[in-house]
Design a protein with these regions (language model features):
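Feature responds to low-complexity, polar/acidic, surface-exposed segments characteristic
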Residues: 2-38, 51-102, 109-177, 190-252, ...
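PEST-like intrinsically disordered low-complexity regions enriched in serine, proline, threonine
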Residues: 44, 106-107
Length: 278
């Protein structure tokens, strides 16, 4: 009898906790109240793509600049090659001393995902447009993006983004500025999208490879149901193990109970968890 009463009380406590818990408390940032945004932001925070402003806020509705977008992009890519670009000056308004120089330089010269302006500037503090953002992301995912777009900018790239699922949950005019929350949605979509690369052999034969996009530092994925993030550990069900070490600690609850992919590094540690879109 006592055990039944205790179980009932425990269930009641858990239910009440779930009801009264504010949405912002479920994630890592106090100013993110939308559940979907909180999930996206936590996926990216685990990966190191977003950090907040140092006082526990993400500023989800603030416009994203071109420099900030490059930092998010390159961090998501997970390549250590970015370090080689931190002392380089390509644009006169992004000197080597600029906080985003390595990210801008790598995205422009290392990966050729975007370019500067005809006057030799990059305009790092200008708000990035939706058209610019999806163009960059489609170039990341497809080596033939420029050809596949039909040379129509930005409509051709926007159509590619829709077809690939990269723009799911975000619908804007090409010239519209994007918010930090909208950018988070785009980047999480990329982590679940297919990447296509084409190559030509010595005989002139072209082959195409398609796979789910992974950051460079991700060596494998594992489909699991996330039970909880407890500090430095992720507890899961349905995986090869019941728990995994996290690269970055988290106690956020917003991803709990979701099915998705653990992205694992070479040491078997969790870079992030990407929910599966049903």
């Amino acid at each position: 009898m006592k055990k039944r009463v205790f179980s009932a009380l425990l269930a009641l406590v858990l239910t009440l906790s779930a009801v009264v818990l504010p949405a912002s408390a479920a994630g890592s940032f106090s100013d993110v109240s939308d559940k979907k945004t909180a999930q996206n932001v936590e996926v990216l925070r685990l990966l190191g793509v977003v950090e907040g402003n140092g006082i526990g806020q993400f500023n989800p509705y603030a416009q994203l600049t071109r420099a900030e977008f490059c930092k998010m992009l390159v961090t998501l890519m997970g390549s250590s090659d970015v370090l080689r670009y931190k002392t380089v000056t390509i644009f006169r308004d992004v000197r080597a001393s600029h906080w985003a120089a390595r990210y801008v330089n790598y995205a422009v010269r290392g990966e050729k995902l975007l370019a500067g302006l005809p006057d030799g500037t990059f305009q790092p503090d200008r708000a990035i447009s939706y058209g610019e953002a999806v163009t960059i992301l489609m170039r990341l995912l497809r080596t033939d993006a420029d050809a596949a777009s039909g040379g129509i900018w930005p409509e051709g790239y926007i159509d590619l983004a829709k077809a690939s699922g990269v723009s799911a949950g975000v619908e804007l005019a090409g010239g519209a500025a994007i918010s930090r929350a909208q950018a988070a949605q785009l980047f999480v979509n990329v982590l679940g999208a297919k990447a296509t690369s084409s190559s030509t052999d010595k005989d002139g034969e072209t082959s195409t490879t398609t796979r789910v996009y992974n950051p460079a530092n991700c060596v494998s994925r594992e489909r699991v149901t996330l039970i909880a993030l407890n500090g430095n550990t992720a507890r899961v069900s349905g995986g090869k193990k019941n728990s995994y070490d996290l690269v970055r600690p988290s106690s956020a609850t917003v991803l709990n109970g979701l099915k998705g992919d653990l992205l694992l590094d070479a040491d078997g540690k969790v870079l992030t968890f990407v929910p599966v879109v049903s």
